[in-house]
């Protein structure tokens, strides 16, 4: 059986790596992949990204199942195209992916279906947005409506920051079409968590909880990024909160999408804010697994990922069960110089470990160049390790990080600090 994974990041490397554990899988193709998937003897990179080319490849190679990693192909309708061609694919349709591709769509959906979220207003006119922010005060959150690779959210702690974010998106067009409409939300306080599930249109299977670290620098300082590290499980999601999230957020979302005539299949990721008194609100939806959360989650998943996806595609997730490694997994992202601004590319990476036990280095922004692994993107690697405690997993991951070198490498030294402290 052949499997195709679409994408080139650390998330896709982790998904492909987990798929190779299935003995019936003869080949895992990754399109377009990265240096990590190129080096792995169980994977083959395919240099294609266009939807039509992916469909043709899946037909020609008789791909049994396709897994979509990133948001962009989903919003381009890759699932619709594969289904039309009679091909098995795991992910939401273009219409369902609006939960992520349009913040305004997601907010209106949540209000309509009574799903707890922050109060908000949407603007296309810069003057009206400025007036609203002046009236509301800071701190306040400015979000680009469209997909902006994790960089479309500004948590403005001052009015000056809020006005600058509005100007960047609406007046200066810094994010292009993604920022032509902005959603302005109330600032929520508490602890964030990532809550991911698999959905088959009706049935829901919860995956392990996790917590991401969005800011570039230690102690959650510096600019927002796509994520600088993550760990699983997230102790902040207690059994009580888990049940509450399923009852008040996940179930109403899946039922609401079906009610709206847009049944949802695929991974669904709710970004949560958990207040000190146990209130939970939805910050955002993503229509795919998180990156870097996927890496620690896949390290802990003991069940067969292919079998779970087969159930999801066939509408039988109610028959599926998951088994998890009881240990913690923690991943540290190593990023290029200048990230999250325009990253420096082409630096050789040395010190990559050959063999690891209870740990794995997942590649993201890497390519093979004359047999050398070099940087090719903002987030370069996610060094992920298992441990009996968060502290031990953290120590194991950082031991490996310390061995890996490339010019200008950036990484946080405190991934998992909340759980270690807690």
Stretches found by the model and what they are:
Residues 369-370, 375-422:
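Generic C-terminus detector
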Residues 161-164, 340-343, 388-395:
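Short, conserved charged micro-motifs
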Residues 1-94:
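ATP-binding N-terminal substructure of ATP-dependent carboxylate-amine bond-forming enzymes
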Residues 4-5, 99-183, 211, 235, ...:
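Active-site nucleotide/adenylate-binding loops and adjacent lid/helix of ATP-dependent enzymes
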Residues 21, 37-39, 90, 112-114, ...:
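Solvent-exposed alpha-helices and their adjacent loops that cap or buttress functional pockets
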Residues 246-268, 286-356, 369:
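Active-site "cap" helix and flanking loop/linker of ATP-utilizing ligase/carboxylase catalytic domains
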Residues 155-294:
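Internal nucleotide-binding/catalytic subdomain
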């Amino acid at each position: 059986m052949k499997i195709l994974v679409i994408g080139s990041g650390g998330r896709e490397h982790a998904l492909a790596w987990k798929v190779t554990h299935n003995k019936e899988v003869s080949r895992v193709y990754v399109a377009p992949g990265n240096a990590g998937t190129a080096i792995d003897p169980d994977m083959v990179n395919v240099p294609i990204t266009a939807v039509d080319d992916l469909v043709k490849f899946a037909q020609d190679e008789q791909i049994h199942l396709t897994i979509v990693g990133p948001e962009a192909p989903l919003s381009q309708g890759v699932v619709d195209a594969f289904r039309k061609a009679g091909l098995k694919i795991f992910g939401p349709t273009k219409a369902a992916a609006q939960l992520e591709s349009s913040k305004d769509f997601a907010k209106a959906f949540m209000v309509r279906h009574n799903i707890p979220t922050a109060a908000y207003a949407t603007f296309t006119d810069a003057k009206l947005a400025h007036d609203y922010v002046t009236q509301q005060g800071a701190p306040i959150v400015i979000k680009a409506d469209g997909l902006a690779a994790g960089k479309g959210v500004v948590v403005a702690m001052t009015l000056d920051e809020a006005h600058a974010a509005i100007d960047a998106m609406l007046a200066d067009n810094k994010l292009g079409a993604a920022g032509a409409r902005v959603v302005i939300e109330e600032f929520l306080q508490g602890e964030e968590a990532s809550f991911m599930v698999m959905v088959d249109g009706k049935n829901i299977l919860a995956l392990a909880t996790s917590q991401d670290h969005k800011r570039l620098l230690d102690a959650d300082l510096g600019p927002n990024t796509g994520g600088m590290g993550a760990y699983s499980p997230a102790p902040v999601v207690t059994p009580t909160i888990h049940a509450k999230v399923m009852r008040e957020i996940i179930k109403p979302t899946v039922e609401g999408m079906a009610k709206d005539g847009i049944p949802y299949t695929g991974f669904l990721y709710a970004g949560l804010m958990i207040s000190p008194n146990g209130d939970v609100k939805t910050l955002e939806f993503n229509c795919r697994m998180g990156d870097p959360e996927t890496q620690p989650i896949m390290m802990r998943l003991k069940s067969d990922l292919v079998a779970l996806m087969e159930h999801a595609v066939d509408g039988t997730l109610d028959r599926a069960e998951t088994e998890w490694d009881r240990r913690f997994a923690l991943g540290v992202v190593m990023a290029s110089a200048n990230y999250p601004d325009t990253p420096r590319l082409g630096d050789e990476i040395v010190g990559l470990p050959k063999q690891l036990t209870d740990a794995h280095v997942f590649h993201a922004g890497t390519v093979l160049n004359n047999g050398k692994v070099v940087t090719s993107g903002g987030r370069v690697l996610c060094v992920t390790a298992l441990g009996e405690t968060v502290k031990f997993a953290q120590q194991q991951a950082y031991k490996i990080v310390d061995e890996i070198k490339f010019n200008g490498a950036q990484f946080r030294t405190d991934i998992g600090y909340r759980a270690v402290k807690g």
